[in-house]
Amino acid sequence: MNLNLNSIFGQFSPDLVLFIPMTLTAVFLNLSWLSISNPSNWLPSRANLLILSFYQEVLKILFQQTNPNTAPWVSAFTAIFILIFSINVLGLLPYAFTSTSHISLTYSIGVPLWMSVNILGFYLAFNSRLGHLVPQGTPSYLIPFMVIIETISLFAQPIALGLRLAANLTAGHLLIFLLSTAIWTLSSSPSIASITLLIFFFLFLLEIGVACIQAYVFTALVNFYLSQNL
């Protein structure tokens, strides 16, 4: 396989990660400290503390406005958040493939979730769900138009759900690629290259934040759609 490292969209080729095992190596090296046992049997291990604290913070942020009806879905939404967040962060490793930058994956996750919560809503309260298509106080002559508009808005939810995640990650990776190319091009001028490298460093930190925020937004929107149907 011929790899074109100068291609701006070459990083989004799915088969790159299969030929470069450094991605998994870096992950295992960074997480190897979790396997170190604690000398005391009375205290929780590092892995238990990390998982527990992360789980509590995720639940606190994601589900602080969750109503009791959506409580059975908390574990599923937490798993979805961890899955998307892990894929986003691992995609920042060198030559790694960010699968969430492809709408084929984001729609494969978002559309079934959207369909499941809406089918559940129509199954539990069919008349109430139909009533949402006509806002309260709508004049009678506007009801047909409002039904069409609300129906289009309803079916636009899964499109926006998957497209938002893929578009933001793609834009962030393209910016990182362009800046790294600029650093290499301007390497003959140390002063300009150092400034560009500093900008690249802060942009990389911002991209880590975007990876977390996009996982949160995706999960929060699915949780919001569920709360509308219960």
Curated annotation (Swiss-Prot):
Q: Which UniProt keywords apply?
A: ATP synthesis, CF(0), Hydrogen ion transport, Ion transport, Membrane, Mitochondrion, Mitochondrion inner membrane, Transmembrane, Transmembrane helix, Transport
Q: Does the keyword Transmembrane apply?
A: yes
Membrane topology category: Multi-pass membrane protein
SUPFAM superfamilies per the UniProt record, alphabetical: F1F0 ATP synthase subunit A
| Gene3D superfamilies hit by this protein | ATP synthase, F0 complex, subunit A
Membrane-spanning residues where? 16-36, 73-93, 106-126, 142-162, 165-185, 192-212
- Signal peptide limits: none
- GO CC: one term? proton-transporting ATP synthase complex
Cysteines paired by S-S bonds:
none
Where does the record say this protein resides?
Mitochondrion inner membrane
Q: What GO MF terms are annotated?
A: proton-transporting ATP synthase activity, rotational mechanism
> Would I find Transmembrane helix among this entry's keywords?
yes
Role noted for this protein: Mitochondrial membrane ATP synthase (F(1)F(0) ATP synthase or Complex V) produces ATP from ADP in the presence of a proton gradient across the membrane which is generated by electron transport complexes of the respiratory chain. F-type ATPases consist of two structural domains, F(1) - containing the extramembraneous catalytic core and F(0) - containing the membrane proton channel, linked together by a central stalk and a peripheral stalk. During catalysis, ATP synthesis in the catalytic domain of F(1) is coupled via a rotary mechanism of the central stalk subunits to proton translocation.
Q: Which PANTHER family does the UniProt record give?
A: ATP SYNTHASE SUBUNIT A (PTHR11410:SF0)
Q: Report the sequence similarity comment from the record.
A: Belongs to the ATPase A chain family.
Instruction: Describe the subunit structure.
Output: F-type ATPases have 2 components, CF(1) - the catalytic core - and CF(0) - the membrane proton channel. CF(1) has five subunits: alpha(3), beta(3), gamma(1), delta(1), epsilon(1). CF(0) has three main subunits: a, b and c.
**Name recorded for this polypeptide:** ATP synthase subunit a
Name the gene behind this protein.
ATP6
